[in-house]
């Protein structure tokens, strides 16, 4: 069971769905998470799959909805995928808020930030975020993928 679950954490598995390869992956390749001076590459699972086992199982169960969407044709073309991006992105963002951006905090923490090394804007925003108990995704929603446009009818 664990072996199969870990196989679904690979970049290859994530990209086996052409909607992921043609859309989010192409955006991700243009970010610092993909290519950077340190050579540390963040993968899909680093941001989208929790490390604690029980949270990982819950995420995998929730991911079955995305597979269902693919199988039933709801997001089986680029056009359909993009039509549902707002809904899909908000699901991810809501989950990250609920977990206090747990996956971000696997690598980042306010306590480890050297604010004096940040530019004035980042220093100010990070200090305010700590004071206001904000979580990473509140400011960094577009860090790995383009933020989708909110639909005219935001009840979607």
Feature annotation, model-predicted:
Residues 1-156:
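Short sequence/structural segments immediately N-terminal
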């Amino acid at each position: 069971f664990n072996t199969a679950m870990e196989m679904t954490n690979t970049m290859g598995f994530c990209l086996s769905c052409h909607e992921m390869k043609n859309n989010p992956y192409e955006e991700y390749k243009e970010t610092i998470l993909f290519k950077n001076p340190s050579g540390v590459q963040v993968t899909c699972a680093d941001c989208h799959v929790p490390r604690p086992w029980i949270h990982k199982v819950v995420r995998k169960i929730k991911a079955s909805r995305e597979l269902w969407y693919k199988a039933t044709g709801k997001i089986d073309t680029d056009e359909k995928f993009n039509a549902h991006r707002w809904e899909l992105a908000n699901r991810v963002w809501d989950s990250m808020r609920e977990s206090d951006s747990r996956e971000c905090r696997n690598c980042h923490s306010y306590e480890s930030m050297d604010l004096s090394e940040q530019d004035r804007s980042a220093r100010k925003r990070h200090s305010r975020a700590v004071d206001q108990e904000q979580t990473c995704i509140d400011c960094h929603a577009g860090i790995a993928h383009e933020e989708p446009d909110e639909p005219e009818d935001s009840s979607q």
